[in-house]
Amino acid sequence: MDNKNFQSKTGFNLENTYLTLPNIFFSEQNPKGSKNPKLIKFNTSLAEELGLNEEVLNSDFGLNIFAGNETFPGIVPIAQAYAGHQFGHFTMLGDGRALLLGEHVTKDCKRYDVQLKGSGRTIYSRGGDGKAALAPMLREYIISEGMHGLGIPTTRSLAVVSTGEEVLRERFEQGAILTRIASSHIRVGTFAYAAQWGTLEDLKSLADYTIKRHFPNIADNENKYILFLEEVINRQAELIVKWQSVGFIHGVMNTDNMVISGETIDYGPCAFMDTYDTNTVFSSIDYAGRYAYGNQPNMALWNLARFSEALLPLLNPNLDEAVNIAKKSISNFSKLYKKYWFNKMRTKLGLFTEKENDELLIEGLLSTMQKYEADFTNTFVSLTLNKFEDEKVFSSDEFKTWYALWQNRLKEENRPQEEVRNLMMNNNPYIIPRNHLVEEALKNAEKGDFTFMDNLLEALKNPYSYSKDLEKYTKLPEKSDTPYVTYCGT
């Protein structure tokens, strides 16, 4: 089947412009394929958004694409090369178990990578087997869709297939492949790789390609590389604020896990915070708390500093001048983050305008929440509904004092109560992909029962809907002596 007929049948409008880059950035390779694949999950709503033929892709024809048994006609799959600072240590990486099948261009000219994750070993695999297990792939499916529902930029999952073979992790698990959709997979680590092992022309080619793809409005500007750095800094500031505002903890914010597009990517050891504590860590390998909830803004800044270092030769031919430009741009991150953070927190408290003491009001609430171990999500739900259950935070003197200050601040706004409530409801999710709910969904799914997962996914499409039907997803996990721990399974 040629590309035209394939496009007509599937809806995929395929290209691979990444192949126009110098060949140090990729390695051509076909997926290994699956002997006995089974379609486990197909994202109908995403397929519809992308203009794909849901019926065809939800059949055996689509299964063979998602299982790596069929590639796109005329398009060469590639594994992408990149480096990464893993917990601060620089190393060569690359797609060790993923292949970019191609780029789908929608009718409104939006371009998306179509990537298979878990499709077999590549030239960059190092010691890994190139495969993925079912539970981690389903976990990424659930959480990425949850993030999308929350309005947070993210890669998404089009399909998950089981491969019919077992993979050895701590135990034998069902093998799987996830089809990931992303604006692109160009990472901070891609630029670090180019700066370390490529030529100046290689670095320039990558920057020009990325600007044309993600920031076309600056492509013809004589200062485009400086503007490029500033645009990436701004997007990351916006993204991290959105993470923080819902208690999302990525868990492994290495430079290879920060993409230039400003999407959330690589959901390995991520989790959502229940009890508000800025020191919260879930990842089994984050012993020192480098990527703790409260440290995520600093780690984003650290990553962006590494990005600016990679761009130095493009910022100015004079190294000292380039360093000064980079420092000036990087210094804006904290200002942008602070601005976006307090703006977001105002909306969570129903405030439409900015006042001098708002920062103290916001910090006062958060410090009280931390002191009394309040649930992050449900505290803001309680404020939104103005209904307070028998939680120790709400009966504390600190909260009562804070509440009076907040009510006075709301009076200064002089807005109708309905407007305030709507603003809060649109910014305080009623539900999130709570860790215990995700684990229950995965536990059942591994046994072949997808009922709970399907219901959870449906609920997560509308997390800001304060519906009685969603109340069961607001319940906290049972108290346990064993802390919740996540692993880099994805």
UniProtKB/Swiss-Prot annotation:
Changing C109G: In strain: 8-6 and NCIB 10662. Its cofactor is Mg(2+); Mn(2+). It catalyses: L-seryl-[protein] + ATP = 3-O-(5'-adenylyl)-L-seryl-[protein] + diphosphate; L-threonyl-[protein] + ATP = 3-O-(5'-adenylyl)-L-threonyl-[protein] + diphosphate; L-tyrosyl-[protein] + ATP = O-(5'-adenylyl)-L-tyrosyl-[protein] + diphosphate; L-histidyl-[protein] + UTP = N(tele)-(5'-uridylyl)-L-histidyl-[protein] + diphosphate. It is an enzyme of class 2 (transferase). Pfam families: SelO (PF02696). Its EC number is 2.7.7.-, 2.7.7.108. GO terms for molecular function: AMPylase activity; ATP binding; magnesium ion binding. Mg(2+) binds at N257, D266. The active site is at D256. Changing V76T: In strain: 8-6. ATP binds at G94, G96, R97, K117, D129, G130, R180, R187, D266. Changing D481N: In strain: NCIB 10662. Keywords: ATP-binding, Magnesium, Manganese, Metal-binding, Nucleotide-binding, Nucleotidyltransferase, Transferase. InterPro entries: SelO. Nucleotidyltransferase involved in the post-translational modification of proteins. It can catalyze the addition of adenosine monophosphate (AMP) or uridine monophosphate (UMP) to a protein, resulting in modifications known as AMPylation and UMPylation. Belongs to the SELO family. This is Protein nucleotidyltransferase YdiU. It comes from Clostridium perfringens (strain 13 / Type A). The gene is ydiU.
